[in-house]
Amino acid sequence: MSIEVKGLRKEFGSQCAVNSISFSVTQGEIVGFLGPNGAGKSTTMKMLTGYLTPDQGKAFISGVEVTSDPLTARKKIGYLAEQNALYPDLYVREYLSFIARVQQVTTIEESVENIIELTGLKPEAHKTIGKLSKGYKQRVGLAAALVHNPAVLILDEPTSGLDPNQLVEIRNLIKAQGKTKTVLFSTHILQEVEAICDRVIIINKGNIVADSPLSKLANTVSLPRAGMSLEEIFRHLTGQPEPF
């Protein structure tokens, strides 16, 4: 398994943010990680990437246990955080070259130019990051996650701030990457899940309430009626009343 989670638990004071969850994701699989705000999505992703230590349980990236060997695990991961920390005074190429050096990429210039082309950054590559629109800043974050050609992509809200045209381009990029990589991404845009994902994991109040191929989701959970949409299933599983 490219991503394997075994009994991960994280508490903040008296609040249990992630409650002993387990799941796995294989190579070539794109999995949507869904849940309302505060459900535990970002906390889980931070534990998977070694930025937060679990209180219990273990996470493995391509067989490497994250807590015991975080540096090796991170080299196998491309991570786009929800709060995408960038350096506003650096030029796009300069920043991506810096990330490539940190990731010990051997062909830095070639890798940077390839990823600029792949993520559609070429028209803005001559600018400093601080002068970019929110959508292009998001592309820079995605390019930084991809520049070292990782086996696993963990993307927290990767389409946030994109206009409809950019959204389609990034959607297609994620789908293309998912053919050879392992992709776990969170989003609040359920249409993105339907367009991109092979499978969906829904988390609510720190607990996994659904884990199923998208096409079989309605058959694997208890629902009040047949023919419910993904949005209706999501609302039902996360305790939201149906709209009138």
Pin down the residues of each PLM region.
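Conserved ABC ATPase "signature" region
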Residues: 97, 101-124
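ABC ATPase "signature
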Residues: 211-212
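A short, surface-exposed alpha-helical micro-motif characterized by mixed small hydrophobic
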Residues: 193-195
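Conserved ABC transporter NBD signature motif
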Residues: 57-68, 72-73
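Catalytic Walker B motif of ABC-type/P-loop ATPase nucleotide-binding domains
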Residues: 153-157
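A short, proline-enriched helix->beta-strand linker immediately N-terminal to the Walker B motif
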Residues: 147-151
